[in-house]
Swiss-Prot record:
Keyword Zinc-finger listed: no
Official protein name in the record: Eukaryotic translation initiation factor 3 subunit I
Assigned keywords, A-Z: Cytoplasm, Initiation factor, Protein biosynthesis, Repeat, WD repeat
Compartments, record wording: Cytoplasm
Organism name: Caenorhabditis briggsae
GO cellular component labels: eukaryotic 43S preinitiation complex; eukaryotic 48S preinitiation complex; eukaryotic translation initiation factor 3 complex, eIF3m
Keyword flag Zinc-finger: no
Length: 327
Protein backbone atom coordinates (compact mmCIF):
# COMPACT_ATOMS: atom_id res chain seq x y z
CA UNK A 1 0.00 0.00 0.00
CA UNK A 2 1.30 3.43 -0.94
CA UNK A 3 -0.91 5.98 0.82
CA UNK A 4 -1.24 9.68 0.14
CA UNK A 5 -2.22 11.60 3.26
CA UNK A 6 -4.18 14.74 2.39
CA UNK A 7 -4.51 17.51 4.95
CA UNK A 8 -7.01 20.17 3.92
CA UNK A 9 -9.63 20.00 6.64
CA UNK A 10 -9.46 21.30 10.18
CA UNK A 11 -12.00 18.87 11.61
CA UNK A 12 -13.28 15.31 11.20
CA UNK A 13 -14.13 14.09 7.69
CA UNK A 14 -17.77 13.36 6.92
CA UNK A 15 -17.63 12.22 3.26
CA UNK A 16 -15.17 11.40 0.48
CA UNK A 17 -16.26 10.67 -3.08
CA UNK A 18 -14.67 10.13 -6.48
CA UNK A 19 -16.12 11.50 -9.69
CA UNK A 20 -17.11 9.00 -12.40
CA UNK A 21 -13.68 8.97 -14.07
CA UNK A 22 -11.88 8.84 -10.73
CA UNK A 23 -9.39 11.62 -11.51
CA UNK A 24 -10.88 13.93 -8.85
CA UNK A 25 -11.57 13.30 -5.16
CA UNK A 26 -14.21 15.36 -3.35
CA UNK A 27 -14.22 15.64 0.43
CA UNK A 28 -16.16 17.46 3.14
CA UNK A 29 -15.77 17.68 6.89
CA UNK A 30 -17.15 19.25 10.04
CA UNK A 31 -15.41 22.46 9.03
CA UNK A 32 -17.18 24.66 6.46
CA UNK A 33 -15.08 24.18 3.30
CA UNK A 34 -15.58 21.14 1.04
CA UNK A 35 -12.44 20.43 -1.00
CA UNK A 36 -11.56 18.88 -4.36
CA UNK A 37 -8.23 17.13 -5.02
CA UNK A 38 -6.33 15.44 -7.84
CA UNK A 39 -6.46 11.71 -7.09
CA UNK A 40 -3.17 11.09 -8.90
CA UNK A 41 -0.88 13.17 -6.67
CA UNK A 42 -3.08 14.46 -3.83
CA UNK A 43 -2.77 18.10 -4.88
CA UNK A 44 -5.63 20.25 -3.64
CA UNK A 45 -7.33 22.08 -6.51
CA UNK A 46 -9.52 24.27 -4.32
CA UNK A 47 -12.46 24.52 -1.97
CA UNK A 48 -16.13 25.49 -2.21
CA UNK A 49 -16.60 28.53 0.03
CA UNK A 50 -20.03 29.61 1.21
CA UNK A 51 -21.23 27.34 4.03
CA UNK A 52 -21.28 28.52 7.61
CA UNK A 53 -21.43 25.22 9.47
CA UNK A 54 -20.37 21.57 9.35
CA UNK A 55 -20.77 20.04 5.88
CA UNK A 56 -22.26 16.56 6.29
CA UNK A 57 -22.36 15.28 2.72
CA UNK A 58 -21.13 15.99 -0.80
CA UNK A 59 -21.99 14.41 -4.15
CA UNK A 60 -20.89 15.08 -7.72
CA UNK A 61 -22.89 14.67 -10.95
CA UNK A 62 -21.92 12.06 -13.57
CA UNK A 63 -20.26 14.65 -15.85
CA UNK A 64 -18.50 16.47 -12.96
CA UNK A 65 -20.23 19.71 -13.93
CA UNK A 66 -22.08 20.19 -10.63
CA UNK A 67 -21.68 19.15 -7.03
CA UNK A 68 -24.10 19.35 -4.13
CA UNK A 69 -23.37 19.80 -0.42
CA UNK A 70 -25.59 19.41 2.66
CA UNK A 71 -24.70 21.39 5.76
CA UNK A 72 -25.59 22.01 9.38
CA UNK A 73 -26.10 25.69 8.53
CA UNK A 74 -29.64 24.75 7.33
CA UNK A 75 -28.76 24.88 3.61
CA UNK A 76 -28.10 22.62 0.65
CA UNK A 77 -25.94 24.27 -2.01
CA UNK A 78 -25.52 23.35 -5.68
CA UNK A 79 -22.07 24.34 -6.99
CA UNK A 80 -20.39 24.70 -10.35
CA UNK A 81 -17.82 21.94 -9.81
CA UNK A 82 -15.18 23.55 -12.04
CA UNK A 83 -15.49 27.21 -11.06
CA UNK A 84 -16.42 26.72 -7.39
CA UNK A 85 -19.29 29.21 -7.60
CA UNK A 86 -22.63 28.58 -5.90
CA UNK A 87 -25.49 28.14 -8.41
CA UNK A 88 -28.43 27.50 -6.05
CA UNK A 89 -29.03 27.56 -2.30
CA UNK A 90 -31.92 25.60 -0.75
CA UNK A 91 -32.92 26.72 2.77
CA UNK A 92 -34.71 24.74 5.47
CA UNK A 93 -35.63 25.15 9.15
CA UNK A 94 -33.37 22.32 10.36
CA UNK A 95 -29.87 20.98 9.51
CA UNK A 96 -29.37 18.96 6.32
CA UNK A 97 -27.73 15.55 6.81
CA UNK A 98 -27.22 13.93 3.41
CA UNK A 99 -27.61 14.73 -0.29
CA UNK A 100 -27.14 13.13 -3.69
CA UNK A 101 -27.65 13.44 -7.43
CA UNK A 102 -29.80 11.15 -9.53
CA UNK A 103 -28.33 9.11 -12.38
CA UNK A 104 -28.92 11.90 -14.90
CA UNK A 105 -27.69 14.65 -12.58
CA UNK A 106 -30.97 16.53 -13.06
CA UNK A 107 -32.57 15.66 -9.71
CA UNK A 108 -31.12 16.23 -6.26
CA UNK A 109 -32.33 14.58 -3.03
CA UNK A 110 -31.53 15.60 0.53
CA UNK A 111 -32.54 14.71 4.09
CA UNK A 112 -33.29 17.11 6.93
CA UNK A 113 -33.03 16.49 10.67
CA UNK A 114 -35.85 16.23 13.19
CA UNK A 115 -35.75 19.20 15.56
CA UNK A 116 -38.32 20.84 17.89
CA UNK A 117 -41.63 20.86 15.97
CA UNK A 118 -40.05 20.02 12.61
CA UNK A 119 -40.10 16.38 11.54
CA UNK A 120 -37.29 14.78 9.55
CA UNK A 121 -37.95 15.03 5.81
CA UNK A 122 -36.59 13.67 2.54
CA UNK A 123 -37.04 16.02 -0.41
CA UNK A 124 -36.28 15.88 -4.14
CA UNK A 125 -35.95 18.87 -6.48
CA UNK A 126 -35.49 19.15 -10.24
CA UNK A 127 -32.58 21.43 -11.17
CA UNK A 128 -34.11 22.06 -14.62
CA UNK A 129 -37.18 23.71 -13.10
CA UNK A 130 -36.36 27.28 -12.07
CA UNK A 131 -39.56 27.52 -10.03
CA UNK A 132 -38.47 24.66 -7.74
CA UNK A 133 -35.03 26.21 -7.23
CA UNK A 134 -36.38 29.68 -6.36
CA UNK A 135 -36.16 30.78 -2.72
CA UNK A 136 -39.08 29.49 -0.66
CA UNK A 137 -40.30 27.16 -3.42
CA UNK A 138 -41.80 23.74 -2.74
CA UNK A 139 -39.99 20.55 -3.78
CA UNK A 140 -41.85 18.14 -6.08
CA UNK A 141 -41.31 15.20 -3.69
CA UNK A 142 -41.33 15.57 0.09
CA UNK A 143 -42.15 13.05 2.79
CA UNK A 144 -41.95 13.35 6.59
CA UNK A 145 -40.79 10.90 9.26
CA UNK A 146 -40.96 10.70 13.06
CA UNK A 147 -37.45 9.24 13.18
CA UNK A 148 -34.37 10.87 11.67
CA UNK A 149 -33.51 9.91 8.09
CA UNK A 150 -29.70 9.67 8.16
CA UNK A 151 -28.96 8.90 4.52
CA UNK A 152 -30.75 8.86 1.15
CA UNK A 153 -29.68 8.08 -2.41
CA UNK A 154 -31.11 7.40 -5.85
CA UNK A 155 -30.84 3.64 -6.26
CA UNK A 156 -32.48 3.15 -9.69
CA UNK A 157 -31.92 5.80 -12.34
CA UNK A 158 -34.06 8.86 -11.55
CA UNK A 159 -37.04 6.89 -10.26
CA UNK A 160 -36.40 5.17 -6.93
CA UNK A 161 -34.91 6.64 -3.79
CA UNK A 162 -33.61 4.52 -0.88
CA UNK A 163 -33.61 5.98 2.64
CA UNK A 164 -31.80 4.78 5.78
CA UNK A 165 -32.97 5.76 9.27
CA UNK A 166 -31.60 6.23 12.76
CA UNK A 167 -33.73 3.28 13.93
CA UNK A 168 -32.09 0.86 11.44
CA UNK A 169 -35.10 0.92 9.10
CA UNK A 170 -34.65 0.98 5.30
CA UNK A 171 -37.32 2.21 2.87
CA UNK A 172 -37.68 2.77 -0.86
CA UNK A 173 -39.96 5.28 -2.56
CA UNK A 174 -40.88 5.42 -6.25
CA UNK A 175 -41.03 9.07 -7.34
CA UNK A 176 -43.61 8.14 -10.01
CA UNK A 177 -46.02 6.99 -7.28
CA UNK A 178 -44.72 8.59 -4.09
CA UNK A 179 -47.66 8.14 -1.70
CA UNK A 180 -46.25 5.17 0.22
CA UNK A 181 -42.98 3.19 0.31
CA UNK A 182 -42.69 0.35 -2.21
CA UNK A 183 -40.19 -1.66 -0.11
CA UNK A 184 -39.38 -1.71 3.61
CA UNK A 185 -36.79 -3.68 5.58
CA UNK A 186 -37.07 -3.41 9.38
CA UNK A 187 -34.86 -6.32 10.40
CA UNK A 188 -31.55 -5.82 8.60
CA UNK A 189 -30.09 -3.46 11.26
CA UNK A 190 -30.81 -2.86 14.95
CA UNK A 191 -29.19 0.59 15.26
CA UNK A 192 -28.63 3.70 13.16
CA UNK A 193 -27.68 3.32 9.49
CA UNK A 194 -24.56 5.44 8.99
CA UNK A 195 -24.00 5.01 5.26
CA UNK A 196 -25.65 3.64 2.11
CA UNK A 197 -23.70 3.11 -1.10
CA UNK A 198 -24.66 1.69 -4.48
CA UNK A 199 -22.51 -0.84 -6.30
CA UNK A 200 -20.90 0.49 -9.50
CA UNK A 201 -23.22 -1.66 -11.67
CA UNK A 202 -26.26 -0.55 -9.70
CA UNK A 203 -27.44 -4.04 -8.73
CA UNK A 204 -26.56 -4.01 -5.00
CA UNK A 205 -26.72 -1.64 -2.07
CA UNK A 206 -24.43 -1.83 0.95
CA UNK A 207 -25.50 -0.41 4.29
CA UNK A 208 -23.22 0.35 7.25
CA UNK A 209 -24.64 0.50 10.76
CA UNK A 210 -23.74 1.23 14.37
CA UNK A 211 -24.84 -2.33 15.23
CA UNK A 212 -21.33 -3.46 14.12
CA UNK A 213 -22.49 -4.94 10.82
CA UNK A 214 -22.74 -4.06 7.15
CA UNK A 215 -25.31 -5.67 4.88
CA UNK A 216 -25.40 -6.37 1.15
CA UNK A 217 -28.92 -5.74 -0.18
CA UNK A 218 -30.76 -6.41 -3.42
CA UNK A 219 -31.48 -3.01 -4.93
CA UNK A 220 -34.88 -4.15 -6.27
CA UNK A 221 -36.54 -5.27 -3.02
CA UNK A 222 -34.09 -4.47 -0.15
CA UNK A 223 -33.73 -8.18 0.61
CA UNK A 224 -30.62 -8.90 2.70
CA UNK A 225 -28.22 -11.10 0.72
CA UNK A 226 -25.08 -11.08 2.91
CA UNK A 227 -23.99 -9.69 6.26
CA UNK A 228 -20.47 -8.66 7.31
CA UNK A 229 -19.66 -8.55 11.02
CA UNK A 230 -17.12 -6.25 12.64
CA UNK A 231 -15.93 -5.82 16.25
CA UNK A 232 -16.82 -2.13 16.33
CA UNK A 233 -19.51 0.17 14.87
CA UNK A 234 -19.32 0.44 11.06
CA UNK A 235 -19.42 4.03 9.78
CA UNK A 236 -18.98 3.38 6.07
CA UNK A 237 -18.85 0.54 3.55
CA UNK A 238 -18.19 0.36 -0.18
CA UNK A 239 -18.22 -2.24 -2.96
CA UNK A 240 -15.32 -2.97 -5.32
CA UNK A 241 -16.09 -2.19 -8.97
CA UNK A 242 -14.26 -5.16 -10.51
CA UNK A 243 -13.91 -7.81 -7.79
CA UNK A 244 -16.22 -9.58 -5.36
CA UNK A 245 -14.85 -7.59 -2.45
CA UNK A 246 -16.28 -5.06 -0.03
CA UNK A 247 -14.53 -2.74 2.42
CA UNK A 248 -15.73 -1.61 5.86
CA UNK A 249 -14.49 1.32 7.90
CA UNK A 250 -15.35 2.42 11.41
CA UNK A 251 -13.92 1.87 14.84
CA UNK A 252 -14.59 2.79 18.43
CA UNK A 253 -16.94 5.73 18.80
CA UNK A 254 -15.10 9.07 18.64
CA UNK A 255 -16.24 10.03 22.15
CA UNK A 256 -14.56 6.97 23.67
CA UNK A 257 -11.34 7.12 21.67
CA UNK A 258 -9.33 8.71 24.50
CA UNK A 259 -10.08 5.70 26.69
CA UNK A 260 -9.08 3.20 24.01
CA UNK A 261 -5.74 1.73 22.99
CA UNK A 262 -5.12 2.21 19.26
CA UNK A 263 -5.06 -1.56 18.72
CA UNK A 264 -8.35 -2.03 20.59
CA UNK A 265 -10.11 0.76 18.70
CA UNK A 266 -10.18 -1.21 15.42
CA UNK A 267 -9.46 1.89 13.34
CA UNK A 268 -8.34 -0.17 10.34
CA UNK A 269 -10.25 -0.53 7.10
CA UNK A 270 -11.22 -4.17 6.57
CA UNK A 271 -11.67 -5.95 3.25
CA UNK A 272 -14.13 -8.86 3.07
CA UNK A 273 -15.02 -11.32 0.34
CA UNK A 274 -18.48 -10.35 -0.85
CA UNK A 275 -19.82 -13.91 -1.19
CA UNK A 276 -18.07 -15.74 1.68
CA UNK A 277 -18.46 -12.88 4.20
CA UNK A 278 -14.87 -13.49 5.37
CA UNK A 279 -12.36 -10.79 6.21
CA UNK A 280 -9.05 -11.38 4.41
CA UNK A 281 -7.17 -8.07 4.65
CA UNK A 282 -7.01 -4.83 6.59
CA UNK A 283 -4.98 -1.66 6.40
CA UNK A 284 -4.12 0.91 9.02
CA UNK A 285 -3.42 4.61 8.77
CA UNK A 286 -5.97 6.73 10.58
CA UNK A 287 -5.54 7.78 14.19
CA UNK A 288 -9.19 7.49 15.15
CA UNK A 289 -12.29 5.98 13.57
CA UNK A 290 -12.86 5.98 9.81
CA UNK A 291 -15.98 8.02 9.04
CA UNK A 292 -16.24 7.59 5.27
CA UNK A 293 -14.73 5.63 2.39
CA UNK A 294 -15.05 5.27 -1.37
CA UNK A 295 -13.66 2.76 -3.87
CA UNK A 296 -12.04 4.21 -6.99
CA UNK A 297 -13.72 3.27 -10.32
CA UNK A 298 -10.52 1.46 -11.39
CA UNK A 299 -10.69 -0.82 -8.34
CA UNK A 300 -7.03 -0.20 -7.41
CA UNK A 301 -7.49 2.71 -4.95
CA UNK A 302 -9.57 3.30 -1.82
CA UNK A 303 -10.04 6.76 -0.28
CA UNK A 304 -10.80 6.96 3.44
CA UNK A 305 -11.64 9.93 5.62
CA UNK A 306 -11.20 9.82 9.38
CA UNK A 307 -11.96 11.57 12.63
CA UNK A 308 -8.32 12.77 12.56
CA UNK A 309 -9.09 15.25 9.73
CA UNK A 310 -7.04 13.45 7.05
CA UNK A 311 -8.08 11.97 3.72
CA UNK A 312 -5.95 8.95 2.89
CA UNK A 313 -5.75 7.69 -0.69
CA UNK A 314 -4.58 4.08 -0.47
CA UNK A 315 -3.24 2.54 -3.65
CA UNK A 316 -3.19 -1.26 -3.64
CA UNK A 317 0.02 -3.12 -4.41
CA UNK A 318 0.50 -6.36 -6.33
CA UNK A 319 -0.24 -8.50 -3.26
CA UNK A 320 -3.87 -7.43 -3.52
CA UNK A 321 -4.19 -6.98 -7.29
CA UNK A 322 -2.85 -10.48 -7.93
CA UNK A 323 -4.74 -12.07 -5.04
CA UNK A 324 -7.06 -14.97 -5.81
CA UNK A 325 -9.32 -16.41 -3.13
CA UNK A 326 -8.79 -20.05 -2.14
CA UNK A 327 -12.08 -21.91 -2.46
Amino acid sequence: MRPLSLKGHERALTRVRFNREGDLTFSCAKDKKPCVWYTENGERIGSYDGHNGAVWDIDVSWDTSKCVTASGDLTVKIWDAELGSCIYTINHQTPMKSCGFSYSGNLVCYTTQKMTKNLSTVQVRDLRDGNQMAEGAESFFSTQFDVNATTALFSQMDDIITIGFESGLLQQYDLRNPDSPINTNEVVHRYSIQDLQLSPRGDFLISASRDKTAALLDVNDLKKLKQYKSERPVNSACIAPNRDHICLGGGEDAMQVTQTAVSAGHFEAKIYHMVFEEEFARFKGHFGPINTMAWHPSGSIIATGGEDGYVRIQEFDEDYLGFTYDF
